[in-house]
Amino acid sequence: MAIDENKQKALAAALGQIEKQFGKGSIMRLGEDRSMNVETISTGSLSLDVALGAGGLPRGRIVEIYGPESSGKTTLTLQVIASAQREGKICAFIDAEHALDPIYAQKLGVDIDNLLCSQPDTGEQALEICDALSRSGAVDVIVVDSVAALTPKAEIEGEIGDSHVGLAARMMSQAMRKLAGNLKNSNTLLIFINQIRMKIGVMFGNPETTTGGNALKFYASVRLDIRRIGSVKNGDEVIGSETRVKVVKNKVAAPFKQAEFQIMYGEGINTYGELIDLGVKHKLVEKAGAWYSYNGEKIGQGKANATNYLKEHPEMYNELNTKLREMLLNHAGEFTSAADFAGEESDSDADDTKE
């Protein structure tokens, strides 16, 4: 339907005035191409990048990663930092829990000499530091570990046992309103690590909830639920964890997909084993009995030996990684089935993760 000519002139004048006053791009038609392509940073796990749909975590947005203790939350964020640093990006880690291990971070590939780190005294201080870093426009990734440790100043200065109902939630709500716009303008990725608590008296449905109120749930573009689902053993020795990540909220692609990978103790995400699994799934790696082959060349009997072969032959690892990324990430935005890369998720699982 054609718009009246007088209305078109009035609209053009209004848009011109808005752009003159607030800057180019402050208002645009939704179909314009300027904001449609989301820039992302890899998580370090190919299957999780595919599950996220856009090929990684979106820049200029807020992301929440939550799960039980020792599920791999901090490890995953350190892998994101390592991925970003390999691309020459500047990263910051706000260590509210005062528990960051620099030696472990270094083992995961983090350049600790160029990682900005802060151990704030109060929750307000931590969030002000986040705001200052995002407004600078120089920092690409900020990680806050964790929301549960962001203690309001009034609570720190008060007595143990004093009631501070809703104080942390109000602090987070105010911070989200302030941070969201600044992150978009500076194209900074802000990741909040969060812990799980149990709602008391819940008889039906999921009793789990996250700390810090509801504001973070609403402002987060992506929410990831990370769980340890098993152990990786070498004989009787436990050397890692089988990990599942569910994308419970996603504003940049289809939600409710999931990815599974191994986190090896002291090493991080087992990208080699992940490539073997994805290679077999997508018929780039052949499996006959216990033997794995790539391009007609046998690379090992059993997954452990095939994984070690890839470690020892980086050129083969890079070739397989490139092929899988081209195959999977080119179609990641087309809302493919989660079964293509991680195993199917039941309807009940999806229902449990709804907010």
Curated annotation (Swiss-Prot):
GO biological process: DNA recombination; DNA repair; SOS response
Keyword Transmembrane helix: no
Residues noted as binding ATP in the record, renumbered to the chain: 67-74
Top-rank taxon, per record: Bacteria
A GO term for molecular function: ATP binding
Similarity field: Belongs to the RecA family.
Name of this chain's protein: Protein RecA
The organism of origin for this protein: Proteus mirabilis
Gene name tied to this protein: recA
